Design a protein with these regions (language model features):
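Residues forming anionic-ligand binding surfaces in small-molecule and nucleic-acid pockets
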Residues: 1, 84-102
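Flexible, glycine/proline-enriched loop segments at strand-loop-helix junctions
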Residues: 1-2, 62-63, 101-110
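Acidic/histidine-rich catalytic neighborhood of metal-dependent amide-processing enzymes
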Residues: 3-82, 132, 217, 221, ...
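Short beta-strand elements
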Residues: 75-79, 89-93, 228-232
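Acidic-enriched catalytic cores of C-N bond-cleaving enzymes acting on peptides and small amides
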Residues: 82-86, 105-135, 153-227
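A structural signal for small-residue-enriched, beta-sheet-centric alpha/beta enzyme cores
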Residues: 99-106, 135-144
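Single conserved hydrophobic/aromatic residue that forms the stacking wall/gate
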Residues: 233-245
């Protein structure tokens, strides 16, 4: 990828004594994809150079004159739990294409975590729903390809809503995600469901969380200036729902 190409180019220049150039310092850091932890922790006091070339293109000989900034938001929602007399079921949203949250956020592809919120909201419109657990996403820089949720609700109503949601989402995402699917099956869990208030708050978080392109560049046609990706959600402990974007 782009990081490996950059390291190879820097090492090749350092290794070739026939190339004319001013003094060069090569700075190589780790964890660029998952939060730039290496760059954040580097001690620059020993560097003498005052100009930096950021080699972050995927083609040899191409230099990108820019710098992409990013911030990670970690949101924790406290939840309460109580018993609820309805069967437990597992809802799965799957079949999405996904992609890189930086280079492919403008493709209009479905976000599995946010679509799960829409499914849960649709179930809640037709029957009493209690959320037990929800999880989705693999990396904070990847568009989620799916999500799963354990719920307590009327089984027949839930099955019908999931069937309709599959049809609706396949029509909505027929170009970008034609294989999207919503399934439901019986499940078991020892965890109590969230209460009504916590369920509503959790579903609202998934549905209303900003996601996708927010602002396009006014200077460069087709360039995304600001975007958000609802990348990860899970129960970090029984009384805490955590999402990352």
């Amino acid at each position: 990828g782009d990081d490996g190409i950059a390291v190879a180019m820097a090492l090749a220049v350092l290794d070739d004594e026939s190339l004319p150039h001013p003094p060069i310092e090569a700075v190589i850091t780790v964890d660029e994809e998952t939060g730039m932890d290496g760059a954040m922790g580097i001690d620059v006091s020993g560097l003498k150079g005052r100009r930096m070339l950021n080699i972050d293109s995927e083609d040899e000989g191409v230099f990108t004159v820019s710098c992409a900034g990013g911030a990670r938001m970690d949101c924790v929602l406290p939840v309460r739990r109580e018993a609820f007399a309805a069967p437990v079921q597992r809802i799965t949203v799957q079949g999405l294409v996904g992609g890189h949250s930086g280079t492919e956020i403008d493709k209009g592809r479905g976000n599995g975590v946010q679509l799960m919120g829409r499914v849960l909201a649709s179930v809640a419109e037709e029957t009493e729903l209690r959320l037990v657990e929800v999880c989705g996403g693999l990396k904070d820089n990847a568009i989620p390809t799916g999500a799963q949720a354990l719920i307590s609700a009327n089984a027949e109503v839930t099955a019908e809503v999931c069937r309709r949601m599959t049809q609706s989402l396949r029509e909505e995402y027929r170009v970008t995600d034609p294989d999207v699917e919503v399934t439901v099956e019986p499940a078991e869990t020892a965890m109590l469901p969230m209460d009504a208030v916590s369920t509503r708050r959790a579903v609202c978080l998934l549905v209303c969380h900003p996601n996708g392109v927010q602002v396009m560049s006014a200077d460069i046609p087709g360039l995304v200036q600001t975007s958000l990706n609802l990348s990860l959600i899970h129960i970090s402990e029984p009384t805490r729902l955590r999402c990352i974007s």
